[in-house]
A protein has these predicted regions:
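Conserved RecA-like ASCE ATPase "motif II neighborhood" in helicase/translocase motors
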Residues: 7-71, 248-252
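Signature of the SF2 helicase/ATPase Hel1-core->accessory helical subdomain module
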Residues: 43-125
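C-terminal accessory regions
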Residues: 77, 249-339
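Conserved helicase/translocase motor-coupling segment
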Residues: 87-93, 110-270, 274-279
Length: 339
């Protein structure tokens, strides 16, 4: 959202959900001029508890939007753009189910148009019309490497042998996957690879919970990323000190979701580790399903690359399992000597 606002030089056409619903939602009397709203990452809508905490309205964002639509004079269209498996924050765990729950308490009949696979999720709608044209299943992010999302899904499911098979397919399509324990090797590689390419974008990504990466140059602590200038980070030219290409500032899953880089350097943190047969995490995070939220965070991070990605794994014995798992999944080892 901030990247679009920065690029368009406008805060009117693209707004954040929280601000929009503070103005027009709940029991407010103000009415928007628009009858069509596009909700990017609609599966990440806040539930009633989170909405109460954020803006004092004990009503979920889906219900708030639909009730607002019913208050309009004649008609309303809610377009939801959905990225499955990308619920990454507290209050988002219910996913698309919240939209069906909201439909179930509406006063007016709502018609849902969706891909066939999602049709069973909207049993509370007055009518469900499925159309496969709404299933946007061809990625524009990975330059025709269409198996990238499948590789990431298999990795997070712990199916390393299937990842190995898919990695050969991806590399054949020109998508590069590297793993390194030398952060300087990663920095050297992206700078050399994209030397002179003024439209190229590469940068540092890390999980918001990976505090151990601070000592390796990943500035992913909360206060830093909260004040980060996300628009310039993605859009400024490489020579700008605010650009991602400066390799100074780090974007987390919250800043980079829905956007992409040519070659991200992804720091793997202590918030998700390999057990030998799958992935695990701490249960101290204040969410309903901490493991799924962490898996989804890494799903976002690992699917940002257009040309590929580099995963940096700290050179500490604790992370040996992660490094070997990524190698077994088909990631090529990158060292400073190799660069």
């Amino acid at each position: 959202m901030k990247v679009l606002q920065h690029t368009l030089k406008s805060r009117v056409f693209v707004q954040d959900v929280l601000g929009f619903l503070k103005t027009y939602g709940a029991a407010g009397k103000a009415m928007p001029n628009e009858h069509i709203w596009v909700f990017d990452e609609a599966q990440r809508a806040f539930d009633a508890d989170m909405a109460r905490e954020k803006r004092g309205a004990a009503i979920s964002e889906p219900e708030d939007f639909l009730r607002l639509g019913e208050r309009l004079d004649s008609w309303a269209v809610m377009v939801g753009l959905i990225g499955e498996g990308q619920e990454i924050n507290r209050g988002e765990e219910a996913g698309l189910r919240q939209w069906n729950d909201a439909l179930g308490v509406m006063d007016k009949p709502w018609i849902v148009h969706c891909p066939e696979a999602l049709a069973p999720m909207f049993s509370s709608a007055a009518q469900v019309l499925s159309d496969e044209l709404l299933n946007l299943d061809v990625t524009l992010r990975s330059h025709r490497a269409e198996s990238t999302h499948l590789w990431v899904a298999q990795l997070l499911a712990g199916n390393l042998e299937e990842c190995k098979r898919l990695s050969r397919e991806l590399k054949g399509q020109g998508f590069e996957m590297y793993v390194t324990r030398d952060i300087e090797a990663a920095r050297l590689y992206v700078r050399e690879r994209y030397r002179g390419a003024t439209d190229a974008r590469y940068g540092l990504l890390a999980s918001s919970k990976a505090r151990n990466l601070l000592s390796y140059g990943f500035t992913n602590e909360y206060q830093y990323t909260k004040n980060m200038r996300v628009g310039p980070w993605f859009a400024d030219p490489p020579e700008s000190s605010y650009s991602c290409c400066a390799l100074r500032d780090t974007a987390t899953e919250f800043q980079c979701q829905g956007l992409e880089l040519d070659m991200p350097i992804i720091g793997w943190g202590h918030d998700l580790w390999w057990t030998g047969s799958g992935w695990d995490c701490s249960t101290r995070y204040h969410v309903k399903d901490p493991r799924q939220i962490r898996l989804n965070a890494y799903r976002v991070l690992l699917t940002r690359g257009r040309d590929g990605f580099i995963v940096f794994v700290p050179p500490e014995p604790t992370y040996d399992g992660v490094f070997h798992a990524l190698e077994s999944a088909g990631c090529s080892s990158l060292s400073r000597v190799w660069v």
